[in-house]
């Protein structure tokens, strides 16, 4: 059985230009490496209406329980202007003891480290199984990735007892933090509709712009909560305001705005929708405007209550890095929001 070098394997993975949702051969390469270690691998390709097909991989070594799973992704975000890079982002290089290239941080190097660790560990006798859930749809719209793999595993009655999500977590020092939950995320797309008219004849129009500004001011200043034991306070941010006006002397017929809320376990997406819709309804009724609202829920908040597995991981990190990681729920969403439906993570 081969033993893999983590740096060499990371470089090999990073050479694939797997800009989400393009696979570029990454999953087949990774499956070959895992099969050489004795893993049984299943490449799962999913597609949805108006989206490109996405390759995913579920690999398992052993049949016994507990089944310890590592979750990650091999898709990366676009590299942007190549002239801004000191190296070709898909020709990784080590400079001043740093691995540079797309995926070095998020998160091909993490995948490589776990696979390399397993290649060294598997010669030992251990109880249970080791599995990997790797997607090619984490950086994009995330509808044909981990979410679909979880649905597949549920249908197959595949049991995962604990899942370690290998996303980058530490901002300053390696080992300083591990995530035991995430805030929920909901995005709102609001349109306030009035009556278009000429600015010289405002009595013949109904300007939705002041109504929208009042609404946005109100929701931006809402104190949703003061935070909870495991979560920071929920927060709403306005991210976009727009009208379709192309002239300076026209009162717009409608105004659109987009906002996002990162919320803790004091709320659900449904409770927030109800609260917000009441605000929109009252404001528009008073102004004789109307409104349209749609929402996209990226995930609900969740928490994995610290247990013997989280403590074992915490102690192992401290042993290696000399830092005891803080247990946190900060930051953005991750695919843990899907995996939590079948396993603590």
Describe each region flagged by the PLM.
Residues 1-80, 254-258, 272-275:
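N-terminal helical capping/dimerization or prosegment-like subdomains
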Residues 19, 75, 139, 169-170, ...:
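Catalytic metal-binding/acid-base residues of hydrolase active sites
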Residues 45, 134, 295-297:
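Residue-level recognition of beta-strand->loop/alpha-helix junctions
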Residues 109-118, 122-218, 228:
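Fold-level recognition of mixed alpha/beta catalytic cores in primary-metabolism enzymes, strongest
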């Amino acid at each position: 059985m081969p033993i893999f070098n983590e740096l060499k394997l990371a470089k090999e993975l990073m050479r694939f230009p797997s800009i989400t949702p393009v696979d570029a051969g990454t999953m087949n390469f990774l499956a070959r490496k895992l099969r050489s270690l004795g893993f049984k691998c299943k490449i799962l390709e999913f597609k949805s209406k108006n989206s490109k097909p996405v390759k995913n991989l579920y690999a398992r070594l052993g049949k016994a329980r507990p089944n310890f799973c590592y979750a990650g992704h091999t898709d990366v975000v676009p590299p942007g202007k190549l002239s801004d890079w000191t190296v070709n982002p898909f020709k990784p290089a080590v400079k001043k003891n740093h691995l540079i290239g797309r995926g070095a941080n998020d998160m091909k190097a993490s995948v490589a480290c776990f696979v390399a660790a397993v290649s060294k560990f598997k010669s030992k006798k251990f109880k249970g199984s080791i599995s990997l859930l790797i997607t090619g749809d984490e950086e994009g719209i995330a509808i044909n990735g981990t979410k679909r793999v979880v649905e597949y595993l549920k249908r197959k009655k595949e049991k995962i007892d604990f899942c370690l999500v290998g996303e980058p977590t530490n901002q300053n020092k390696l080992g300083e933090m591990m995530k035991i939950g995430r805030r929920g995320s909901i995005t709102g797309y609001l349109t306030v509709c009035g009556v278009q008219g000429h600015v010289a004849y405002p009595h013949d129009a109904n300007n939705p712009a002041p109504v929208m500004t009042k609404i946005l001011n109100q929701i931006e200043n809402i104190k949703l909560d003061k935070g909870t034991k495991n979560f920071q306070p929920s927060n709403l941010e306005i991210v976009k305001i727009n009208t379709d006006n192309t002239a300076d002397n026209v009162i717009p017929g409608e105004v659109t705005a987009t906002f996002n809320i990162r919320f803790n376990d004091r709320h659900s997406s449904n409770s927030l929708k109800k609260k917000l819709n009441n605000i929109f309804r009252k404001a528009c009724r008073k102004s004789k405007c109307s409104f349209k609202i749609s929402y996209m829920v990226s995930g609900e908040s969740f928490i994995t209550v610290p247990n013997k597995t989280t403590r074992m991981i915490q102690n192992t990190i401290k042993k290696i890095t000399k830092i005891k990681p803080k247990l946190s729920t900060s930051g953005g969403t991750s695919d843990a929001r899907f995996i939590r439906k079948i396993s603590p993570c």
